[in-house]
Amino acid sequence: MRSAIEEKIVTARIALLLKKPFFGNMATRLKLIEKPEIGTAATDGRHLWYAPEFIERLNPKQTEFLLAHEVLHVAFEH
C-alpha cells in the first residue's frame, strides 16, 4: 500500500506523462525510495530518493517540476 507521499509522486508522474511524455516516461523508470535524511530529493538514474517532509510541502505543479528536474540529471548524466 502506498503512502500519501508516494501517491503524490505517482500522480505527478502521470501528469508528466500526459503533459511532457519524455519527462514522464523517464520519471516512471525511477524506483521511489523514502530517505528523510537527504532533506529534498536526489537520483542516481535508477532510484529517486526523497524526503517525505519536503515532498509534503510541495504543491502538485512543484512536484511535477521536481520530477522533471531530477529526470534532467539522468538525461544529462550528471
Residue ranges: model-predicted function:
Residues 1-67, 71-78:
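Basic/hydrophobic alpha-helical interface regions
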